[in-house]
């Protein structure tokens, strides 16, 4: 079997296609969550705290400056505001995935309905069997 035909077999399998669709949807969902956190959730929280822009929060370890030759030296800072935004994004994505997995588990783990009892055909067959037994016992 050639490599091309093996690759076709591999790529056509349902799991690979499902995985590819999941990756594309996940990437799009990540962008939606990023926009939700950065543009909708964090601005009101920042406003409530006192007009704080979380994306600009940082601990400055060394401020920006100019060296002896006049060259700009950038600041050295730990941007914890971006970290807070990322943590909020993670929590939202993790919660959404939790809900999705819970829904999938509920659908796939449904217990089949309990049998309602024997069908009419089974009852009829039982009557025939019992009748044949009785006839055999009477004649024997």
From Swiss-Prot:
Keyword Cell division (UniProt): no
Subcellular localization, as worded in the UniProt entry: Cell inner membrane
Subunit structure, as described in the record: Homopentamer.
Family of this protein: Belongs to the MscL family.
Protein's job: Channel that opens in response to stretch forces in the membrane lipid bilayer. May participate in the regulation of osmotic pressure changes within the cell.
Record NCBIfam families: mscL, PRK00567.1-4
Protein name from the UniProt record: Large-conductance mechanosensitive channel
Organism: Xanthomonas oryzae pv. oryzae (strain KACC10331 / KXO85)
Chain's gene name: mscL
């Amino acid at each position: 079997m050639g490599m091309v035909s093996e690759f076709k077999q591999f790529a056509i399998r349902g799991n690979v296609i499902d995985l590819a669709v999941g990756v594309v949807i996940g990437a799009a969902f990540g962008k939606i969550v990023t926009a939700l956190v950065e543009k909708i959730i964090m601005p009101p929280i920042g406003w409530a705290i006192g007009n704080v822009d979380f994306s600009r929060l940082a601990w400055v370890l060394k401020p920006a400056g100019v060296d002896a030759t006049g060259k700009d030296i950038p600041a050295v800072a730990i941007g914890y505001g971006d970290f807070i935004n990322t943590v909020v994004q993670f929590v939202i994505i993790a919660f959404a995935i939790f809900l999705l997995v819970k829904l999938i588990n509920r659908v796939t783990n449904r217990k089949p309905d309990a049998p309602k009892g024997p069908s009419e055909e089974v009852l009829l067959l039982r009557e025939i069997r019992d009748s044949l037994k009785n006839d055999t016992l009477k004649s024997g």
